[in-house]
Amino acid sequence: MASEDGEMPSQFEGIDPEQLTESQMQQYMMEMQRQGLLDSNMEGGQYEEGYEEGQEGEGYGEEYGDQDYDGNQNEYDSQQDSQQQGHDQVNEMHQDRYDRRVNSEISGNYEADDETLRKIRRDLLDNINLERRHRDLQPVYIDLTTNNISQYYSEYLVNNEHNQDFYENAKVRYNNLGECELCHITAKFEPDADITKEYIYDYFMEIGYLFLESEEEKRIILNPANNHIGIGVFFDEIQIVVVLILSEKVLCIQKISQPEQNKIEIRGKMLDENFGIYAIRIMNVDDQKKDIKGVGPEFIEYTRSTQEWMASFELELYNQDRMAIEYYTRVSPDSIPYKKKQSKNEKLTYKHLQLRLRTPFQIYPDPKYAAEDEKERIRKEQEILAHEEQERKEREENDAKRLKQSRKDYGDGQYDDDEHGQDDFNSQSDISDKDKHHDSMHAEQEQNQQAAQQQQDTISNKEIRQELEMAITEAQRQHDEFMLQNHKLQEEIKLLKNKNDGFVDRSNETAMNEHKYLNTLAHVHQIRLDLKQTQTRYNQMSQELQKKLEQKQKKCNEIKYAFLELKREVAKKAANSRTDKPIPEQQINEWEKAELQKSKELQELRLQILRLRNAYVKNQKILKKKEELAEGLHLIDFEQLKIENQTLNEKIEERNEELHKLKKKNTTTIQILTHTREKLGFVQGENGELNSQNVRKDQELDDMRKQLTQQKKTKDKLRSVNLTLKQQTGIVNSEELGQDYRDLRTRVSKLEEEKKRLEQKLRSMHEAIKTANQISTQNMQSQNNSLKKPYQPY
């Protein structure tokens, strides 16, 4: 992966871009675009298409040979300005995230990490499912596709208003399948709020509950048909955004893992018993007709009782194509031949299957979730152990105080008996009666305490006896399994020890470890029982409060509607004081609408008052903290802090100016690169024409060489014939031969002149061919240099 400072990715260092494959070139362009080294307005096809195919690449204008560079550049600029700006803002947001993190460290504000955002998304999902469970609805599952769309759209909403076209384009961009419903909320931070990790988390949770305040969004979230959800959360220094996308699917994906190298395992569940999973297709996102892998029912295990299924197959992951997974279903799952081998002649087809779900190819759930769950589990266990330890200490202290008090009471009684014995030695019967009385009172006190303690123990034992027996049974079963496994491992250890130095008896250590294990196991089960009891108690309290709230809400709505009806009836029966005419129905409706609007405004004002009150309390706490911190500081310290703050602000401005210069330089470089690519296409076109001319000239030269050879052969034949004739007859005595000889000489001279002319023409053609070859070589060298060396701006 690329570094945050915009350096070249390590896998592409020292590689000529012309030597990359198409998929590697796309990955290279995406990485350069993510780092901000390429303009995000330009699509991937603009860097790949050329003029060799005779097509008009997007952003290039018309063919370079017909118009000059200025015309092409103007058309290119107009096309670039007409593209949507939303995708650019989302891409630039990732690039500026590092700068915002640096600025947040300088200014003291908190920049939430990915772990916090993941926790926010998971807790929002838990809250939604908890609300659905209270209404006896099925939980919603994560849809990986809409999850990516919602996160992408939340990043867009940080700097923009809701745009339905952009939302639809995002669905197409991520290959969404089926209909879905959108809910979103944008909320600004409270003024002068201390932006911390806890504040951001609490604010997200508070805003999440606002979805249930709106009737439309509440209907979407609590719709029984919706069983999948995508959650997107994002924020900047002034506001937060929460996006929910809900949809209906017939199956859900529970896990996508890679247990072994080049092996994929997918687990899921059918949410509709009338359908069964039949096939899984791995496809190329860029070319959806290209199948990377397709598996049928012979690779799928299906459990009809739980409607859960698992698909396991081999898949080579060395290619760099962007992949997606498609899930095909068929009716009547009982008739699908799961885990049955099919003949080699049978080919998997998707023609009569129903495409129900499409997800991106990625590991799910994220492996980072497991580490975070483990941390959360350890933290909760530590809290439970600390709470248990604190309760144990409190019980011990109470027992010690109670025992000390009882001993003190008993000691006071004995002291009183001794005083009475010293005052009246003769009244032994009274003393013995008093001793018996004190003894009986003390015994009765102890009996009462023991009875109360026994009663408490009996009540607590009755409450947890059944669960404790179940836990002990489960612990005993696990203990037996562990003992059996331990016995097998000990047998293997014995064999290994006998081969080496013999077996050393460790029975005492094993018994001690077993004793520790049993104690720890009992302690863990006790903690689990206490946790379960506490959770059950809290759930009961929550359900009771929820029922009370619903009853009060229902009663409130009834009273509200009754009051509205009463007002309407009174208004209908009322008459105008001037005209004695009844009030029109339209006027009553307008009054009701105005009253409803005022009630909404009143509700918003109440909510705003609550927020302002909370902000007031927080500001008071912050002010107290600042007052406590400012006790040891003096005026000179504040002046020094002010100077340092000003210095840091100047550095920030300098960095922003440098960043602006780099962006301008980047834009200029992109324009030069585009112009060079256009010029390269034009030069390649000229080079092709010159090559075609060169081929034609070579053909003409070959034809003329053949003619010259034929003429030479004819000349040789005529020369031999002439020699023969000379030998047969003399030239002096024959006027015809003399005339013929003179004609031949004239013809030979003409042919020699023609030969010289053709040789001169041949030399000129050779020079033209040589010049064309030199031009072609220079063009190829300039092309290679332009691709290998960085361009300097004009």
Curated annotation (Swiss-Prot):
Keyword Methyltransferase: no
Compositionally biased tracts (Basic and acidic residues): 89-103, 386-411, 431-445
Bias-annotated ranges (Low complexity): 24-35, 446-456
Biased composition (Polar residues): 774-787
GO biological process: cilium assembly
Gene from which this protein is expressed: CFAP184
Region ranges (Disordered): 1-105, 386-458, 774-794
Feature: compositional bias, Acidic residues: 49-69
Coiled-coil segments on the chain, per record: 461-613, 638-775
Record-annotated membrane-spanning stretches: none
Description of how the protein assembles with itself and partners: Forms a complex with CFAP263; the interaction is required for functional activity in cilia.
Name of the protein described by the UniProt record: Cilia- and flagella-associated protein 184
Source organism superkingdom: Eukaryota
